């Protein structure tokens, strides 16, 4: 499926940490989904996991942008969308006037070649700003301290070595550059045994078919390269690399919800977060309904 303004992808080198089973499964999924789009189905129906959540991701990135502006770290310059998948994150970033270039890095070649162009066209991305990359987010073929923003949307929890991944982020980010991460995190009281139980769950038949895995094969979330972390484990990983990290958790009132929706709640919550940040507080609230999806804003110290 040709999209006129879509740039040819660049191919970056890959580390041994790239999960090959997940990579081949993602390629299989991409080919299936593109065939369904060609047959007449809407991309939103075919790949609802990321595409249907476009507005939510856009809102979360805008919250991060407002917060960064408040702490004098505006969203601008060169960005990397890590584990870009459908390209939704790169699409959102392309609409920020002060973002000049986005590297959309995804290790599934078929997602880069076939799915990203459809996503960019559907959501009216600024094609000129986005350079698609077939590559591994553990090895970015970029100079040291050359990037201003790194974006993660549900990708870092696939890292086989979070310490290694954050080392690479730290290498390419300029001083005072920032990571915006929208990712899954569990309450701190969760034990490692509890998290391991989640990872040992078998993929259902529909997912096995989608990813080209034989239905009768035993295949768990762990086998697919998933990992689970508590909020504090994420925070510790950032702090070990000298990032100053703020965490936003989603919250909504149980009553009078319609009244809340009439208020400028995004600006109210980001302003409150800024005031708490000045007082040394690093955990904040934002309006939302997904209790396990957190927004991390991590600024690299000089």
Please give the residue ranges for each predicted region.
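N-terminal, positively charged/glycine-rich alpha-helical extensions of SAM-dependent methyltransferases
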Residues: 1-46
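Acceptor-substrate binding/catalytic loop of class I
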Residues: 217-233
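Conserved alpha-helix/loop element of class I SAM-dependent methyltransferases that forms part
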Residues: 55-75
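Conserved class I S-adenosyl-L-methionine
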Residues: 180-208
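A C-terminal cap/extension of S-adenosyl-L-methionine-dependent methyltransferases
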Residues: 232-236, 245-302
């Amino acid at each position: 499926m040709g999209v006129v303004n879509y740039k040819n992808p660049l191919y970056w080198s890959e580390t041994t940490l790239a999960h090959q089973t997940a990579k081949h499964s993602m390629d299989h999924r991409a080919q299936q989904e593109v065939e369904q789009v060609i047959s007449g189905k809407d991309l939103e129906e075919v790949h609802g996991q990321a595409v249907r959540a476009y507005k939510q991701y856009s809102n979360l990135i805008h919250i991060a942008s407002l917060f960064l502006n408040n702490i004098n770290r505006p969203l601008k310059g060169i960005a990397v969308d890590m584990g870009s998948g459908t390209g939704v994150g790169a699409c959102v970033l392309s609409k920020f006037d002060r973002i000049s270039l986005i590297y959309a890095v995804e290790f599934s070649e078929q997602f880069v070649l076939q799915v990203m162009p459809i996503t960019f066209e559907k959501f009216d991305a600024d094609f000129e700003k986005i350079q698609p990359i077939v590559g591994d987010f553990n090895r970015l073929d970029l100079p040291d301290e050359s990037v201003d923003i790194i974006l993660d949307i549900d990708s870092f929890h696939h890292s086989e070595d979070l310490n290694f991944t954050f080392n690479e982020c730290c290498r390419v980010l300029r001083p005072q550059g920032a990571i915006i991460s929208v990712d899954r995190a569990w309450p701190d009281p969760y034990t490692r045994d509890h998290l391991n139980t989640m990872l040992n769950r078998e993929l259902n038949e529909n997912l096995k078919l989608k990813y080209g895995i034989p239905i009768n094969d035993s295949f768990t979330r762990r086998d697919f390269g998933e990992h689970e972390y508590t909020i504090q484990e994420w925070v510790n990983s950032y702090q070990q690399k000298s990032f100053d990290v703020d965490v936003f958790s989603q919250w909504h009132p149980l009553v009078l919800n319609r009244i809340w929706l009439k208020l400028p709640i995004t600006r109210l919550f980001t302003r409150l977060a800024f005031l708490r940040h000045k007082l040394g507080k690093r955990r904040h609230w934002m309006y939302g309904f997904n209790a396990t999806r957190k927004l991390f804003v991590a600024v690299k110290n000089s």
